[in-house]
Amino acid sequence: MSLTYMNMFMAFTISLLGLLLYRSHMMSSLLCLEGMMLSLFVMMTMVILNTHLTLASMIPIILLVFAACEAALGLSLLVMVSTTYGMDYVQNLNLLQC
């Protein structure tokens, strides 16, 4: 495994750990999700370019489209929760809360 692959895998792992450990605020969760998507995009692009897979060259672009949709939905949810409750805690997303 080359150094670049190892760095991308570590970036994905650190983002996943950040998502699991710092999940009280929604903004930090969204940033960790974006870090995971960015490392996946770079890793998939490197694998496709190194293996010369021409049929799978659209997969990283599709991943970027899903990442943009995820970011837009996450930011709109962040704005909605922060205007409704005045803070960006993830625990405010519970619909069963009285």
Swiss-Prot record:
GO BP term (any one): ATP synthesis coupled electron transport
Family: Belongs to the complex I subunit 4L family.
InterPro entries: NADH_UbQ_OxRdtase_chain4L/K, NUOK/Mnh_C1-like
Name of the protein this chain belongs to: NADH-ubiquinone oxidoreductase chain 4L
Phylogenetic placement of the source organism: Eukaryota, Metazoa, Chordata, Craniata, Vertebrata
Gene from which the chain derives: MT-ND4L
Keyword Chloroplast (UniProt): no
Reaction(s) this enzyme catalyzes, per UniProt: a ubiquinone + NADH + 5 H(+)(in) = a ubiquinol + NAD(+) + 4 H(+)(out)
Origin species: Platyrrhinus helleri
Functional description taken from the UniProt entry: Core subunit of the mitochondrial membrane respiratory chain NADH dehydrogenase (Complex I) which catalyzes electron transfer from NADH through the respiratory chain, using ubiquinone as an electron acceptor. Part of the enzyme membrane arm which is embedded in the lipid bilayer and involved in proton translocation.
